[in-house]
Design a protein with these regions (language model features):
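Phosphate-binding site recognition
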Residues: 1-210
């Protein structure tokens, strides 16, 4: 089952921002960062290219050899099967905490190649930065934090009718008893999943097969 994540709406707004900076997406592992970036790339761009510094260790040399975005992109093109076109390709740097030079390169993409759409993601990035004494290009990136699935996102997927009802009412209106009971039930179910995407999808998919 597809869970609509609010972070993708924020990505869409960022895409249309004239003074756009690369996104640095932070968050724990297994909360859906990679899924969100790839979904955004598929839905909003002609192409998307993902470079994973954890799985593709050879990528590190590309950033160690040059700080020029033009040179970096020319070499990265050798590692993917889609063109890297400004405005048409979303460039994803995944697990960027594994390559300090790639993290630093975001500064140069901001200054010298702002026409490219770049999202970089890191797991436990704050820990890595402190432990390895890495530097984040402050002021040259838009830092975003992603969390596990919220109750709002869960309810939207699990019980669309109740979600739509809640969205349409006035905030000061008293909720009918049936809605309150439904919300309590859904919240208990949400707590069982813990907001982790795999657990939420497994629960909702299993219900669909019953």
């Amino acid at each position: 089952m597809k869970i609509e994540r609010d972070i993708i709406r924020i990505f869409r707004e960022w895409k249309e921002t004239p003074q756009r900076k690369p996104i640095l997406l932070q968050g724990a592992r297994q909360i859906g960062k990679t899924w969100a970036m790839e979904t955004f790339g598929r839905e909003e761009f002609e192409y998307y290219a993902k470079f994973d510094f954890d799985r593709q260790v050879e990528l590190k040399s590309v950033f160690q050899n040059s700080k020029s975005p033009e040179r970096i992109l020319k070499e990265l093109a050798l590692y993917c099967d889609v063109p890297l076109i400004p405005g048409k390709t979303l460039i994803i740097f995944d697990e960027i905490q594994e390559c300090e030079e790639a993290l630093n390169s975001l500064k140069y993409f901001c200054e010298d190649a702002p026409e490219y759409h770049i999202i970089a993601a890191g797991s436990l990035l704050g820990v890595a930065v402190k432990k390895r004494k890495m530097t984040v290009p402050v002021g040259k990136v838009r830092v975003m934090r992603m969390y596990p699935i919220s109750f709002k996102e869960f309810l939207r997927a699990s019980n669309p009718r109740t979600f739509e009802y809640i969205e349409e009412i006035n905030a000061i209106e008293k909720l009918p008893e049936i809605i309150l009971n439904t919300l309590k039930l859904e919240y208990r179910r949400y707590l069982v999943c813990g907001g982790m995407p795999d657990a939420v999808c497994a629960m909702l998919d299993n219900e669909g097969m019953e």
